[in-house]
Structures are given as structure tokens and as C-alpha cells.
Amino acid sequence: MSSVNSHKKYDAILVAGEGKSSYKVHHQNKAFLTINGKCLVHYIVETLQQVESIRDIYVVGLKDELQQVFLTGHVDLSFPKRIHIVEQRSNLYENVWHTFLKSLKSENEEVPYTESHRDQAMLIVPCDAPLMTPQEVEYFTSHANMENYDHVLGLVSQKKLKYFYPQEGKPGIKMAYLHIKEDSFRINNLHLVKPLRIENREYIQKMYQYRYQRNFKNLVLFALSIFG
């Protein structure tokens, strides 16, 4: 597949907030879990700093805790990318939406409706992907066809992930998949999106809240919230 956005640059939102719909590990925000003495959110920032197609990085979450993590980890907030730390709101949707407005330099957070603003895309990145590489992000941003689409998300085929399955004598992990006609895929949570082009944004938080569809209760509640 050829590159379609090889020279475009995007701001990135790193979502590191917590709320009642977020999934915790050992009762802790995943962003602050440590591997080899370094928080997950620190790993992601280091990766994004090496991606050529990214301009500024906006990290949204518990501001005081994030500032302490970056201070302790000696993270330069101005080089090679400028890092903005944004206080979290009440849920994932509000975190992304209000951070996007900040990136537009809208001090009063009013929504601008010029065509250039409506076509402005941002990269949205999770805080719990410490193995993510700069090359992976660069490939995704350069191949996402934002000329013809308003939202592009990354997928990994089930076949590629079988290498991580438990094997004889070795631990591993199996994941839930999105099953479509072409194949079964795992969403990798890289999103390139034009927020002002997305209609019915109020459903985004509902989808996130009830995202674990193996829980039958979530399936029913999501259906009721949409059709009830």
C-alpha cells in the first residue's frame, strides 16, 4: 500500500485519564503502571516524540500526577515535541473533545466552524501500549486516507496476533476480535479523526462505556441507550 499522507503532520492526544468507565489494573490507572521503573505513559510519550508526522503532544489525565511522572522521568516538555498536559474531564469523550478544542487555540473553547477547522484531524493514542513503536505510528499516519475519510482506525489481523497466544510451556495472551467478512481483527486503538466532522458525538461515550460486549448486561444497556 502506498503512502497517501507522507508529508502531513498532526497533533496527538494521548488519553491517560481515569473515570468510572476506564479499566483499572490492580485498582490503579493503567497510565501509571510501571515497567522497569518507568510508567506506561512515559513510554508512549517517548515513542510519540520520535514520530516525524506528529507536531504537538497533548496528554490528558490527572494533571498533577502526570507532571510528577514527567518531572521524575526527566521528560523535556518542549523538545523534540512540545508536550501539553491537560486536566481530565468526567469521561473519555469529554477528554478528547475539550483537548481537541485546546489544540485549536480556542481559549474560550467555542467551536470554530470554518472548513479548515472541520477538516483538521488529530491522532488519538491510548496510554496502555508500551510496545508501540515510532515506525508503527508513522506507517499508520502516512497511510490513513484522510482526504476521503473522517475517521481511520488501526486494525491487526488475528493471524498476526497468534504469535502471542499461549504455547506449550510458555505463557501468552488471547484477545477478543472484531469479526467481519474479510477476516477477524483486533482494533489497535490508533485513531486518526476529524472531530468536527463526526455527527452524533453523544453516542461515543455510550459505546465506550458499554464496550465489553462479552458482558451481556453491557450489550443490553447499549442497545437500550441507542434504541430505547
Residue ranges with predicted function:
Residues 1-26:
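N-terminal nucleotide-binding beta1-loop-alpha1 segment
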Residues 72-120, 131-132:
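Short phosphate-binding loop-to-helix
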Residues 121-125:
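Short aromatic-hydrophobic micro-motifs that form the base-stacking/packing surface
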Residues 126-130:
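The conserved acidic donor/metal-binding loop of glycosyltransferases
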Residues 27-45:
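Short catalytic helix/loop segments, enriched in acidic residues and glycine
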Residues 64-70:
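Short, charged/polar "capping" segments at the starts of alpha-helices
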Residues 47-54:
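Short, acidic, metal-binding catalytic loop of nucleotide-sugar glycosyltransferases
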Residues 132-228:
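Conserved core of the sugar-phosphate nucleotidyltransferase
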